[in-house]
Protein backbone atom coordinates (compact mmCIF):
# COMPACT_ATOMS: atom_id res chain seq x y z
CA UNK A 1 0.00 0.00 0.00
CA UNK A 2 1.65 3.20 -1.22
CA UNK A 3 1.68 6.18 1.14
CA UNK A 4 0.23 9.41 -0.28
CA UNK A 5 0.84 12.37 2.06
CA UNK A 6 -1.75 15.07 2.65
CA UNK A 7 -1.18 18.72 1.76
CA UNK A 8 -0.42 19.73 5.34
CA UNK A 9 2.67 17.59 5.91
CA UNK A 10 6.06 16.80 4.47
CA UNK A 11 5.88 13.13 3.51
CA UNK A 12 3.91 12.25 6.64
CA UNK A 13 5.61 14.55 9.13
CA UNK A 14 4.84 17.98 10.57
CA UNK A 15 7.74 20.11 11.78
CA UNK A 16 7.17 22.42 14.73
CA UNK A 17 9.49 24.85 16.48
CA UNK A 18 9.67 24.38 20.25
CA UNK A 19 11.91 25.68 23.02
CA UNK A 20 14.11 22.64 22.41
CA UNK A 21 14.35 23.32 18.70
CA UNK A 22 12.65 21.82 15.66
CA UNK A 23 10.54 18.74 16.43
CA UNK A 24 9.04 16.31 13.92
CA UNK A 25 5.48 15.17 14.69
CA UNK A 26 3.83 12.32 12.83
CA UNK A 27 0.91 13.56 10.74
CA UNK A 28 -2.55 12.01 11.13
CA UNK A 29 -2.47 10.98 7.48
CA UNK A 30 0.66 8.90 8.11
CA UNK A 31 -0.82 7.37 11.26
CA UNK A 32 -3.90 6.36 9.28
CA UNK A 33 -1.78 4.91 6.47
CA UNK A 34 0.41 3.01 8.92
CA UNK A 35 -2.67 1.53 10.62
CA UNK A 36 -4.30 0.51 7.33
CA UNK A 37 -1.04 -0.95 6.06
CA UNK A 38 -0.66 -3.03 9.23
CA UNK A 39 -4.26 -4.26 8.99
CA UNK A 40 -3.80 -5.29 5.35
CA UNK A 41 -0.60 -7.22 6.11
CA UNK A 42 -2.23 -8.95 9.09
CA UNK A 43 -5.29 -9.75 6.98
CA UNK A 44 -3.15 -11.62 4.44
CA UNK A 45 -0.97 -13.25 7.10
CA UNK A 46 -4.02 -14.55 8.99
CA UNK A 47 -5.35 -16.57 6.09
CA UNK A 48 -7.74 -14.17 4.35
CA UNK A 49 -7.89 -13.79 0.57
CA UNK A 50 -6.69 -10.31 -0.36
CA UNK A 51 -9.17 -10.26 -3.26
CA UNK A 52 -11.96 -9.75 -0.70
CA UNK A 53 -10.15 -7.01 1.24
CA UNK A 54 -12.19 -4.08 -0.09
CA UNK A 55 -15.55 -5.86 -0.19
CA UNK A 56 -18.51 -3.75 0.91
CA UNK A 57 -21.70 -5.49 2.16
CA UNK A 58 -23.74 -2.84 0.39
CA UNK A 59 -22.83 -4.61 -2.86
CA UNK A 60 -24.37 -7.87 -1.62
CA UNK A 61 -26.19 -9.48 -4.56
CA UNK A 62 -29.58 -10.99 -3.75
CA UNK A 63 -32.74 -10.58 -1.70
CA UNK A 64 -33.30 -13.91 0.07
CA UNK A 65 -30.75 -13.42 2.84
CA UNK A 66 -30.56 -9.66 3.35
CA UNK A 67 -31.83 -10.05 6.92
CA UNK A 68 -29.01 -12.42 7.88
CA UNK A 69 -26.49 -10.24 6.03
CA UNK A 70 -27.62 -7.33 8.20
CA UNK A 71 -27.34 -9.51 11.31
CA UNK A 72 -23.69 -10.20 10.46
CA UNK A 73 -23.08 -6.46 10.12
CA UNK A 74 -24.68 -5.99 13.55
CA UNK A 75 -22.46 -8.79 14.92
CA UNK A 76 -19.40 -6.74 13.96
CA UNK A 77 -20.87 -3.58 15.50
CA UNK A 78 -21.64 -5.39 18.76
CA UNK A 79 -18.31 -7.23 18.99
CA UNK A 80 -16.58 -4.49 20.96
CA UNK A 81 -19.73 -3.22 22.68
CA UNK A 82 -20.96 -6.48 24.17
CA UNK A 83 -18.35 -8.92 25.58
CA UNK A 84 -20.86 -11.79 25.33
CA UNK A 85 -20.82 -11.50 21.54
CA UNK A 86 -17.09 -12.34 21.48
CA UNK A 87 -17.76 -15.80 22.91
CA UNK A 88 -20.59 -16.80 20.57
CA UNK A 89 -20.55 -19.86 18.34
CA UNK A 90 -22.10 -18.81 15.03
CA UNK A 91 -22.92 -20.89 11.97
CA UNK A 92 -23.31 -19.48 8.45
CA UNK A 93 -24.85 -22.03 6.09
CA UNK A 94 -25.34 -21.72 2.35
CA UNK A 95 -24.70 -23.52 -0.95
CA UNK A 96 -21.65 -22.70 -3.07
CA UNK A 97 -21.61 -19.26 -4.65
CA UNK A 98 -23.68 -17.48 -2.01
CA UNK A 99 -20.98 -15.00 -0.89
CA UNK A 100 -20.39 -16.65 2.51
CA UNK A 101 -16.60 -16.52 2.39
CA UNK A 102 -16.60 -13.01 0.94
CA UNK A 103 -18.86 -11.73 3.71
CA UNK A 104 -16.83 -13.40 6.44
CA UNK A 105 -13.66 -11.91 4.96
CA UNK A 106 -15.32 -8.52 5.47
CA UNK A 107 -15.99 -9.48 9.09
CA UNK A 108 -12.31 -10.31 9.52
CA UNK A 109 -11.23 -7.02 7.98
CA UNK A 110 -13.54 -4.96 10.18
CA UNK A 111 -12.52 -6.68 13.41
CA UNK A 112 -8.82 -6.46 12.57
CA UNK A 113 -9.35 -2.75 11.95
CA UNK A 114 -10.89 -2.48 15.44
CA UNK A 115 -7.78 -4.09 16.93
CA UNK A 116 -9.02 -7.64 17.50
CA UNK A 117 -7.15 -10.76 16.43
CA UNK A 118 -8.99 -12.80 13.80
CA UNK A 119 -7.92 -15.91 11.91
CA UNK A 120 -9.45 -17.52 8.82
CA UNK A 121 -8.80 -21.19 8.15
CA UNK A 122 -10.30 -24.25 6.54
CA UNK A 123 -11.52 -26.99 8.86
CA UNK A 124 -9.33 -29.55 7.08
CA UNK A 125 -6.26 -27.41 7.87
CA UNK A 126 -7.36 -27.12 11.50
CA UNK A 127 -7.69 -30.90 11.83
CA UNK A 128 -4.27 -31.42 10.26
CA UNK A 129 -2.75 -28.87 12.63
CA UNK A 130 -4.27 -30.57 15.69
CA UNK A 131 -2.97 -33.93 14.52
CA UNK A 132 0.49 -32.53 13.80
CA UNK A 133 0.64 -31.24 17.37
CA UNK A 134 0.57 -34.89 18.49
CA UNK A 135 3.07 -36.12 15.90
CA UNK A 136 5.99 -38.35 16.87
CA UNK A 137 8.31 -35.95 15.06
CA UNK A 138 9.19 -33.57 17.88
CA UNK A 139 10.12 -30.63 15.67
CA UNK A 140 6.89 -30.95 13.68
CA UNK A 141 4.83 -31.32 16.85
CA UNK A 142 6.38 -28.30 18.58
CA UNK A 143 5.79 -26.10 15.55
CA UNK A 144 2.14 -27.18 15.39
CA UNK A 145 1.66 -26.73 19.15
CA UNK A 146 2.97 -23.17 18.90
CA UNK A 147 0.37 -22.46 16.22
CA UNK A 148 -2.39 -24.06 18.31
CA UNK A 149 -1.40 -21.81 21.21
CA UNK A 150 -1.68 -18.77 18.94
CA UNK A 151 -5.16 -19.90 17.97
CA UNK A 152 -6.10 -20.06 21.64
CA UNK A 153 -5.11 -16.41 22.01
CA UNK A 154 -7.07 -15.34 18.92
CA UNK A 155 -10.28 -13.41 19.58
CA UNK A 156 -12.24 -14.95 16.72
CA UNK A 157 -11.58 -17.91 14.45
CA UNK A 158 -13.51 -18.19 11.19
CA UNK A 159 -13.59 -21.82 10.06
CA UNK A 160 -14.62 -22.32 6.44
CA UNK A 161 -15.65 -25.54 4.67
CA UNK A 162 -16.72 -26.75 8.10
CA UNK A 163 -18.02 -30.29 8.62
CA UNK A 164 -17.97 -31.02 4.87
CA UNK A 165 -16.78 -34.58 4.23
CA UNK A 166 -16.03 -33.65 0.61
CA UNK A 167 -13.52 -31.04 1.80
CA UNK A 168 -12.03 -32.92 4.76
CA UNK A 169 -9.78 -35.94 4.90
CA UNK A 170 -11.45 -38.19 7.46
CA UNK A 171 -10.17 -41.69 8.10
CA UNK A 172 -12.59 -44.57 8.45
CA UNK A 173 -11.54 -45.06 12.05
CA UNK A 174 -12.71 -41.52 12.75
CA UNK A 175 -9.90 -40.97 15.23
CA UNK A 176 -9.51 -37.33 14.12
CA UNK A 177 -12.99 -36.56 15.42
CA UNK A 178 -11.83 -36.50 19.02
CA UNK A 179 -9.31 -33.78 18.12
CA UNK A 180 -12.05 -31.61 16.61
CA UNK A 181 -14.46 -32.29 19.46
CA UNK A 182 -11.93 -31.50 22.19
CA UNK A 183 -10.69 -28.36 20.47
CA UNK A 184 -14.17 -26.90 19.96
CA UNK A 185 -15.21 -27.65 23.55
CA UNK A 186 -12.02 -26.18 24.98
CA UNK A 187 -12.27 -22.98 22.95
CA UNK A 188 -15.92 -22.43 23.81
CA UNK A 189 -15.94 -23.77 27.36
CA UNK A 190 -12.53 -23.20 28.95
CA UNK A 191 -11.35 -20.24 26.88
CA UNK A 192 -14.78 -18.63 26.35
CA UNK A 193 -13.84 -17.47 22.86
CA UNK A 194 -15.84 -17.31 19.67
CA UNK A 195 -15.99 -19.42 16.53
CA UNK A 196 -17.75 -18.59 13.28
CA UNK A 197 -18.36 -21.72 11.21
CA UNK A 198 -18.97 -21.30 7.48
CA UNK A 199 -20.38 -24.33 5.72
CA UNK A 200 -22.23 -25.88 2.78
CA UNK A 201 -23.58 -28.40 5.28
CA UNK A 202 -26.73 -27.65 7.24
CA UNK A 203 -26.13 -27.84 10.95
CA UNK A 204 -28.62 -30.70 11.32
CA UNK A 205 -26.55 -32.78 8.87
CA UNK A 206 -23.14 -32.58 10.56
CA UNK A 207 -23.31 -36.16 11.83
CA UNK A 208 -24.55 -37.41 8.45
CA UNK A 209 -21.40 -35.89 6.92
CA UNK A 210 -19.10 -38.22 8.80
CA UNK A 211 -18.70 -36.26 12.02
CA UNK A 212 -19.77 -37.53 15.41
CA UNK A 213 -23.13 -37.06 17.10
CA UNK A 214 -21.25 -35.48 19.99
CA UNK A 215 -19.84 -32.73 17.76
CA UNK A 216 -23.19 -32.02 16.10
CA UNK A 217 -25.00 -31.96 19.43
CA UNK A 218 -22.53 -29.52 21.01
CA UNK A 219 -22.29 -27.16 18.03
CA UNK A 220 -26.03 -27.19 17.39
CA UNK A 221 -26.80 -26.55 21.04
CA UNK A 222 -24.39 -23.59 21.27
CA UNK A 223 -25.59 -22.06 18.00
CA UNK A 224 -29.31 -22.47 18.64
CA UNK A 225 -29.01 -21.33 22.27
CA UNK A 226 -27.98 -17.85 21.16
CA UNK A 227 -29.91 -17.78 17.87
CA UNK A 228 -26.71 -17.66 15.82
CA UNK A 229 -27.73 -19.80 12.85
CA UNK A 230 -27.56 -17.77 9.64
CA UNK A 231 -28.21 -18.66 6.01
CA UNK A 232 -27.01 -17.21 2.72
CA UNK A 233 -29.27 -18.55 -0.02
CA UNK A 234 -28.75 -16.05 -2.85
CA UNK A 235 -26.56 -17.68 -5.49
CA UNK A 236 -24.31 -14.87 -6.65
CA UNK A 237 -22.76 -16.88 -9.49
CA UNK A 238 -26.12 -17.80 -11.02
CA UNK A 239 -27.39 -14.22 -10.93
CA UNK A 240 -24.12 -12.92 -12.39
CA UNK A 241 -24.15 -15.39 -15.27
CA UNK A 242 -27.80 -14.64 -15.98
CA UNK A 243 -27.26 -10.88 -16.09
CA UNK A 244 -24.00 -10.97 -18.05
CA UNK A 245 -24.76 -10.85 -21.77
CA UNK A 246 -21.33 -9.96 -23.12
CA UNK A 247 -18.04 -11.77 -23.61
CA UNK A 248 -14.47 -10.87 -22.85
CA UNK A 249 -13.13 -12.97 -25.73
Task: Give names to the regions the model predicted.
Residues 59-90, 109:
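Pre-Walker A (pre-P-loop) alpha-helix and adjacent loop at the N terminus of AAA/AAA+ ATPase modules
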Residues 85-104:
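Walker A/P-loop nucleotide-binding motif
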Residues 67-73, 95, 109-153, 170:
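Short glycine-rich substrate-engagement loop in P-loop NTPases that contacts/grips substrate
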Residues 116-117, 153-157, 190-197:
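Loop/turn-to-beta-strand initiation segments
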